[in-house]
């Protein structure tokens, strides 16, 4: 999804963002090979349309992976700020792991990765934030955009983090 939104992969030529995408919501976003040329700022320079990254403080990659929870924040950190007000958002749910963003874990996943089978404690906030994002940026709803930056933080747990630019 990030490639369609305008990310340039390390070591690959730049490709324009897909014009059909008006906004991107990325569950567990990432930046593979963060130290590779051309650098993260150039790699994410074309992420100009609205973008929301949803991740967790324990959202490491599955198995042997170069993705850490901190890496999940890099697309937001290196994307340009919105021109006419905030249009880039990062929501980090405390304790959230990778499978929390895939829905309810199956019995096999639960036994392999020791994850809970019930929905994540932050599920309602994830749904509210993502719905407001779509309403704000696809529906051009100024009230939803205002709620996202002013009211959403009051609904989050004290250990969750929400940023926008």
Say what each PLM segment does.
Residues 3-6, 27, 50, 82, ...:
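Structured segments of extracytoplasmic/periplasmic soluble domains
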Residues 21-22, 85-88, 157-159:
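Sequence-level motif detector for i,i+2 pairs with an aromatic at +2
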Residues 45-124:
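Active-site-adjacent alpha-helix of alpha/beta-hydrolase-fold enzymes
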Residues 5, 30-33, 66-71, 140:
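A short linear-motif detector with a strong N-terminal bias
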Residues 11-14, 72-81, 148-151:
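Intrinsically disordered, low-complexity boundary segments flanking structured domains
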Residues 95-98, 103-165:
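Alpha/beta-hydrolase-fold serine-hydrolase catalytic core, especially in secreted/extracellular enzymes
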Residues 1-47:
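Primarily recognizes the serine-hydrolase "nucleophile elbow" in alpha/beta-hydrolase
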Residues 22, 88-91, 128, 132:
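Active-site-proximal helix/loop capping residues that flank conserved catalytic or ligand/cofactor
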